[in-house]
A protein has these predicted regions:
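Conserved acidic carboxylate
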Residues: 13
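Two-component/phosphorelay signaling modules centered on CheY-like receiver
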Residues: 16-35
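Acidic catalytic/metal-coordinating carboxylates
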Residues: 39, 65-71
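The feature encodes the CheY-like receiver
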Residues: 62, 96
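As written
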Residues: 103-109
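C-terminal output helix
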Residues: 116-125
Length: 130
Protein backbone atom coordinates (compact mmCIF):
# COMPACT_ATOMS: atom_id res chain seq x y z
CA UNK A 1 0.00 0.00 0.00
CA UNK A 2 1.52 3.40 -0.94
CA UNK A 3 2.23 5.96 1.76
CA UNK A 4 -0.38 8.68 1.95
CA UNK A 5 0.75 12.22 2.55
CA UNK A 6 -0.29 13.70 5.86
CA UNK A 7 -2.89 16.48 5.64
CA UNK A 8 -1.08 19.82 5.58
CA UNK A 9 -2.15 22.69 7.83
CA UNK A 10 -0.92 26.16 6.92
CA UNK A 11 -0.79 28.41 10.00
CA UNK A 12 -0.61 32.10 9.10
CA UNK A 13 0.45 34.12 12.15
CA UNK A 14 2.83 37.03 12.71
CA UNK A 15 3.38 36.51 16.45
CA UNK A 16 6.57 34.43 16.94
CA UNK A 17 5.40 33.06 20.29
CA UNK A 18 2.19 31.75 18.74
CA UNK A 19 4.19 30.18 15.90
CA UNK A 20 6.48 28.39 18.35
CA UNK A 21 3.53 27.22 20.46
CA UNK A 22 1.71 25.88 17.40
CA UNK A 23 4.83 23.95 16.35
CA UNK A 24 4.92 22.36 19.80
CA UNK A 25 1.22 21.54 19.65
CA UNK A 26 1.60 19.83 16.27
CA UNK A 27 4.37 17.66 17.69
CA UNK A 28 1.62 16.23 19.92
CA UNK A 29 -0.83 15.73 17.03
CA UNK A 30 0.14 12.71 14.95
CA UNK A 31 -1.31 12.54 11.49
CA UNK A 32 -0.86 16.20 10.56
CA UNK A 33 1.87 18.25 8.92
CA UNK A 34 2.30 21.93 9.78
CA UNK A 35 3.64 24.74 7.63
CA UNK A 36 4.10 28.28 8.92
CA UNK A 37 3.72 31.67 7.24
CA UNK A 38 4.23 35.00 9.00
CA UNK A 39 2.60 37.28 6.41
CA UNK A 40 -0.19 37.19 3.90
CA UNK A 41 2.37 37.27 1.09
CA UNK A 42 4.15 34.20 2.51
CA UNK A 43 0.80 32.46 2.82
CA UNK A 44 -0.09 33.18 -0.82
CA UNK A 45 3.26 31.76 -1.93
CA UNK A 46 2.81 28.65 0.24
CA UNK A 47 -0.71 28.08 -1.05
CA UNK A 48 0.45 28.33 -4.66
CA UNK A 49 3.29 25.90 -3.99
CA UNK A 50 1.64 22.95 -2.27
CA UNK A 51 -1.80 21.47 -1.70
CA UNK A 52 -3.10 22.36 1.74
CA UNK A 53 -5.96 20.75 3.67
CA UNK A 54 -6.61 23.47 6.26
CA UNK A 55 -5.57 27.12 6.50
CA UNK A 56 -5.57 28.71 9.98
CA UNK A 57 -5.35 32.49 9.54
CA UNK A 58 -4.81 35.19 12.14
CA UNK A 59 -7.06 38.11 11.27
CA UNK A 60 -4.37 40.75 11.90
CA UNK A 61 -1.26 40.23 9.77
CA UNK A 62 1.42 42.87 9.12
CA UNK A 63 0.81 43.15 5.37
CA UNK A 64 -2.93 42.45 5.10
CA UNK A 65 -5.87 41.23 7.13
CA UNK A 66 -6.95 37.62 7.15
CA UNK A 67 -10.09 38.71 5.31
CA UNK A 68 -7.99 40.30 2.58
CA UNK A 69 -5.87 37.15 2.26
CA UNK A 70 -8.99 35.02 1.80
CA UNK A 71 -10.46 37.47 -0.71
CA UNK A 72 -7.22 37.53 -2.73
CA UNK A 73 -7.28 33.76 -3.02
CA UNK A 74 -10.92 33.84 -4.11
CA UNK A 75 -10.17 36.56 -6.69
CA UNK A 76 -7.38 34.51 -8.30
CA UNK A 77 -9.24 32.02 -10.51
CA UNK A 78 -6.31 29.62 -10.85
CA UNK A 79 -5.41 29.60 -7.17
CA UNK A 80 -9.04 29.42 -6.12
CA UNK A 81 -9.62 26.40 -8.38
CA UNK A 82 -6.46 24.69 -7.09
CA UNK A 83 -7.61 25.22 -3.50
CA UNK A 84 -11.15 23.92 -4.01
CA UNK A 85 -12.14 22.01 -0.87
CA UNK A 86 -9.51 23.58 1.38
CA UNK A 87 -10.96 24.49 4.77
CA UNK A 88 -10.33 28.04 6.04
CA UNK A 89 -10.43 28.99 9.73
CA UNK A 90 -10.24 32.60 10.93
CA UNK A 91 -8.35 33.05 14.22
CA UNK A 92 -8.45 36.05 16.50
CA UNK A 93 -8.21 37.02 20.13
CA UNK A 94 -10.54 39.95 19.40
CA UNK A 95 -14.22 39.90 20.23
CA UNK A 96 -15.77 38.35 17.13
CA UNK A 97 -18.81 40.63 16.81
CA UNK A 98 -19.37 41.44 13.14
CA UNK A 99 -16.05 39.83 12.19
CA UNK A 100 -17.61 36.36 12.20
CA UNK A 101 -20.11 37.37 9.52
CA UNK A 102 -17.40 39.13 7.49
CA UNK A 103 -15.19 36.03 7.72
CA UNK A 104 -17.99 33.76 6.51
CA UNK A 105 -18.80 36.15 3.66
CA UNK A 106 -15.12 36.15 2.65
CA UNK A 107 -15.14 32.35 2.44
CA UNK A 108 -13.97 31.17 5.86
CA UNK A 109 -15.51 27.94 7.11
CA UNK A 110 -15.28 28.84 10.79
CA UNK A 111 -14.00 31.38 13.31
CA UNK A 112 -12.01 30.27 16.36
CA UNK A 113 -11.12 32.48 19.29
CA UNK A 114 -7.52 32.48 20.52
CA UNK A 115 -5.97 31.11 22.58
CA UNK A 116 -6.80 27.67 21.23
CA UNK A 117 -6.08 24.70 23.45
CA UNK A 118 -4.78 21.36 22.18
CA UNK A 119 -8.03 19.35 22.53
CA UNK A 120 -9.99 22.13 20.81
CA UNK A 121 -7.49 22.25 17.94
CA UNK A 122 -7.39 18.49 17.54
CA UNK A 123 -11.17 18.04 17.55
CA UNK A 124 -11.66 21.07 15.31
CA UNK A 125 -9.19 19.83 12.70
CA UNK A 126 -10.66 16.34 12.73
CA UNK A 127 -14.18 17.72 12.36
CA UNK A 128 -13.08 19.76 9.32
CA UNK A 129 -11.80 16.71 7.47
CA UNK A 130 -14.61 14.31 8.39
Amino acid sequence: MPDRALPLVLYVEDDRIHLILMEEVFRLLPGWELRLAETGAEALAALAERRTAVVLVDMNLPDMTGLELRRRVSADAGLSAALQGVRWIALSADDPGALVRAAREAGFDDYWLKPIDVPQLQSGLQRLLD
